[in-house]
A protein has these predicted regions:
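Acidic, metal-associated active-site segment
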Residues: 106
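Ribosome large-subunit tunnel/peptidyl-transferase-proximal elements
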Residues: 1-103, 113, 121, 131-146
Length: 146
């Protein structure tokens, strides 16, 4: 069986709106990453950009289960000796909650140039205000069992 190849005329991009209120971070990120990849479409092609745009609102109300709020750290290195920096999740949530969701989704996308293009289709906002009413985003309910 041959791999389906999507042409430019067949490409259709939709906009989805996701409310992150009281959703576990991992469940939210995995389902958003699936939409960004286009896995929810019948014309999914793994080597093409066929996903949809996703707007995540209320990122400051996302949940972590267990004791991860105190124990989870985001680490990065500046490139200089002794330049390991770490930020706790509680600090990240209070200061940059949109970045916490973006990092979680980024980790679930492919680690190549196609994954970087998919990440540009993601918009994350701390509150319910977003400037994408002109795109007429469709509100979808994700499975956020807890």
């Amino acid at each position: 069986m041959k791999t389906y190849m999507q042409t430019a005329e067949q490409k259709s991009e939709k906009w989805y709106l996701v409310d992150a209120t009281n959703m576990p971070l991992g469940r939210l990120a995995s389902q958003v990453a699936s939409i960004l990849r286009g896995k929810n479409k019948p014309e999914f092609t793994p080597n093409q950009l066929c996903g949809d745009h996703v707007i995540v609102i209320n990122s400051d109300k996302v949940l972590l289960t267990g004791r991860k709020v105190e124990q989870k750290f985001y680490r990065y290195h500046t490139g200089y000796m002794g330049g390991l920096k770490e930020i706790s999740y509680s600090t990240m949530l209070s200061e940059k909650s949109d970045l916490a969701v973006t990092v979680a989704v980024k980790g679930m996308l492919p680690k190549n140039s196609l994954g970087r293009k998919m990440l540009k289709y993601l918009r994350v906002y701390k509150d319910a205000n977003h400037g994408h009413e002109a795109q007429k985003p469709e509100l979808i309910e994700l499975d956020g069992r807890r």
